[in-house]
Curated annotation (Swiss-Prot):
Molecular function in Gene Ontology: 4 iron, 4 sulfur cluster binding; ATP binding; ATP-dependent FeS chaperone activity; iron-sulfur cluster binding; metal ion binding
Cofactor binding note of this UniProt entry: Binds 4 [4Fe-4S] clusters per heterotetramer. Contains two stable clusters in the N-termini of Nubp1 and two labile, bridging clusters between subunits of the Nubp1-Nubp2 heterotetramer.
Name of this protein: Cytosolic Fe-S cluster assembly factor Nubp1 homolog
Binding site for ATP: 63-70
Amino acid sequence: MQAPPPEHCPGVESEQAGLVSACAGCPNQRICSDPNKKLEDPGKALVAAAMKDVKHKLLILSGKGGVGKSTVTTLLTRYLARSYPDSNFGVLDIDICGPSQPRLLGAVGENVHQSGSGWSPVGIDDNVCLMSIGFLLGSVDDAIIWRGPKKNGMIRQFLSEVDWGTLDLLLLDTPPGTSDEHLSVVSYLRDDSAPDSLKAIIVTTPQEVALLDVRKEINFCKKQRIPIVGVVENMSSFRCGNCGNSSEIFPAKTGGAAAMCQEMDVPLLGSLPLDPQVTRACDSGEDITAINNSTTEALATICSKIMASL
């Protein structure tokens, strides 16, 4: 029988299992550090029990920072919640060092409460809830300076100790790249008996400097056996509010997301414009999905494809 994992356990699937300072004194240290032993992370069973009523999990990924993953996560959540009022949606912010969902969803200053069932996520709308480390900080300016094992422990807590209730879809906002956060959340949520329960959306901008890293993220998903719902091209164009002309702020010199999707055999879900209304709404935490403009028209197409894929 395995002992409970220490608070900052790196996870038995990690290359650091049994080797980092958090493992000191753990009864399983010798077993975890044995390269010939393959163990199931005891935290995985706790996560599975806590997430049993969450039907679908959707990772929002990108290899590049600054492409708008968090903004896209917010827009998708808002539009889906408005379009499917009888469904329940959750957002989990696992960008541990840069949590932005409380700001984007208008929940700055909210507190997380604890009950016998665990942490209660913050309610955003009637059918939307949010959990983020941003709610656990003393100030929005507090820096989180953690190594991988501590991030892993925090993600495990979010997945196993938050009372999500019954959700039709949980969207997970991730940091850029393929780092500890990504490996942790995939190891806990991937279920080989239900491979379609965890899927991914990739966010990019049109220019090649972003596409270079996004290709790596797509390959990460393929290696980790995570089905890719498709790619969202963000900030594809900018329409001037004065003259009405459209401009390419990030020129697609190599064909943009469309060419990359064809090259890598993944679907293109759609393109979102660079919209000043969205920028202002993100800063204030307002919901703009009720208005009719080019952004919401694009969201309608993207969200219908997402729901059809689940």
